[in-house]
Amino acid sequence: ACSGRGSRCPPQCCMGLRCGRGNPQKCIGAHEDV
């Protein structure tokens, strides 16, 4: 289960990253607020 709001998170978002709001393809650091 990926954290974040995107439904098309790339696999690396499942490894401590989250998907950026408005751009589910873009990973951002888990410390950033989405």
Curated annotation (Swiss-Prot):
Main location: secreted
This protein's UniProt keywords: Disulfide bond, Gamma-carboxyglutamic acid, Hydroxylation, Ion channel impairing toxin, Knottin, Neurotoxin, Secreted, Toxin, Voltage-gated sodium channel impairing toxin
A GO molecular function held by the record: toxin activity
Keyword Disulfide bond: yes
Subcellular location: Secreted
Modification sites for 4-carboxyglutamate: 32
Disulfide bond positions: 2-14, 9-19, 13-27
Keyword Iron annotated: no
Record-linked InterPro entries: Conotoxin_TVIIAGS
Expression by tissue: Expressed by the venom duct.
Residues with 4-hydroxyproline modification: 10-11
Superkingdom of source: Eukaryota
Gene Ontology annotations for the cellular component aspect, listed alphabetically: extracellular region
Domain notes: The presence of a 'disulfide through disulfide knot' structurally defines this protein as a knottin.
Function: Mu-conotoxins block voltage-gated sodium channels (Nav). No effect was observed upon injections into mice and goldfish (25 ug).
Name this protein carries in UniProt: Mu-conotoxin GS
